Amino acid sequence: MEQELMRIGVSLPEKLLSRFDEIISQRGYSSRSEGIRDAIRNYIIHYEWMSDVEGERVGVITIVYSHHQRGLVDSLTDIQHEFGSIINSSLHVHLDKDNCLEVVILRGEGKDVRRAAERMMALKGVKHVKLTTTSVGAEL
């Protein structure tokens, strides 16, 4: 059964759209819409995977962000203080004149690790966030 398609509008930075167009062309998509549908499916799968994090976990949150975004550094710091009881370490790297990389290592309940990552993902100026989790090793 074919689903009804809904038309939406999306505003994207030119550079991001250009890179997306290159990738969908290389992958052989028939249209930009097909590439966007695939990207949304992958986003949903990633979200569902993140939601399934239970029990004690070790997590690594990798964040790439613009350090020019007003208030972003303070917001990231505030979130790290809020989750200070589960954050073991963080590393800050200046990637170039515009971008920084933050790596945050956490250990705690999976839901808390996930919440910390989601809070960072939602901040304006954050370009990329990746959460990787693993067992603490006790059940291995």
Swiss-Prot record:
One of its GO terms (molecular function) is DNA binding. Signal peptide: none annotated. Keywords: DNA-binding, Metal-binding, Nickel, Transcription, Transcription regulation. Disulfide bonds: none annotated. The keyword Transcription applies. Binds 1 nickel ion per subunit. Pfam families: NikR_C, RHH_1. Gene3D superfamilies: ACT-like. Chain A, domain 2, Met repressor-like. InterPro entries: Acetolactate_synth/TF_NikR_C, ACT-like_dom_sf, Arc_rbn_hlx_hlx, CopG, CopG/NikR_regulator, Ni_resp_reg_NikR, Ribbon_hlx_hlx, TF_NikR_Ni-bd_C. Transmembrane segments: none annotated. Its cofactor is Ni(2+). The keyword Transcription regulation applies. Ni(2+) binds at H81, H92, H94, C100. One of its GO terms (biological process) is response to nickel cation. NCBIfam families: PRK00630.1, PRK01002.1, PRK02967.1, PRK04460.1. HAMAP family: NikR (MF_00476). Transcriptional regulator. Belongs to the transcriptional regulatory CopG/NikR family. This is Putative nickel-responsive regulator. It comes from Methanothrix thermoacetophila (strain DSM 6194 / JCM 14653 / NBRC 101360 / PT) (Methanosaeta thermophila). The lineage of its organism: Archaea, Methanobacteriati, Methanobacteriota, Stenosarchaea group, Methanomicrobia.
